[in-house]
């Protein structure tokens, strides 16, 4: 499974992603860490598109290895989010503007997301609990769409 946590810089993406990954025994992939490691693209739309492709490729490798990838980065446009093709998305909508003018101008509010964090309580555990409850409910809902999966458990 590929989970995308996105939003403006400073919105709490990494603060949520790190403990979320630990709780579900997933692999956390942070956009800043990946960008810093390679440092080969700028922050233009093209550079951000290339970063999104790289993040998606790394996450796909984690999923292929049988783990859950929890990816956090800005992912500024609806098209990028669509191309990233996450199984579950969390939109961190906790700030109106970041300190980066170009990112503010480029960032598009999402057409859709699985979970929308509109305020940060200052309590990571409380916020994480809300996201996790929704995530589990969503997975159970998807599981109910495939009743044949129960038969696999019994074999």
Predicted regions and their residues:
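The conserved Walker
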Residues: 8-9
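Conserved lysine of the Walker
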Residues: 13
């Amino acid at each position: 499974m590929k989970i995308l946590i996105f939003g403006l810089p400073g919105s709490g993406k990494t603060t949520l992603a790190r403990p979320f990954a630990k709780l579900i025994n997933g692999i956390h992939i942070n956009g800043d860490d990946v960008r810093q490691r390679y440092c080969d693209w700028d922050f233009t739309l093209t550079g951000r598109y290339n970063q999104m492709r790289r993040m998606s490729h790394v996450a796909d490798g984690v999923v292929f290895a049988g783990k859950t990838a929890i990816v956090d980065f800005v992912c500024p446009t609806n098209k990028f989010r669509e191309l990233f093709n996450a199984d579950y998305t969390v939109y961190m909508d906790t700030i109106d503007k970041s300190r980066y003018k170009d990112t503010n101008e480029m960032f598009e509010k999402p057409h859709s997301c699985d979970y929308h964090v509109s305020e940060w309580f200052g309590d990571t555990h409380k916020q994480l609990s809300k996201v996790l409850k929704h995530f589990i409910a969503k997975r159970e809902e998807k599981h109910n769409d495939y009743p044949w999966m129960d038969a696999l458990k019994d074999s």
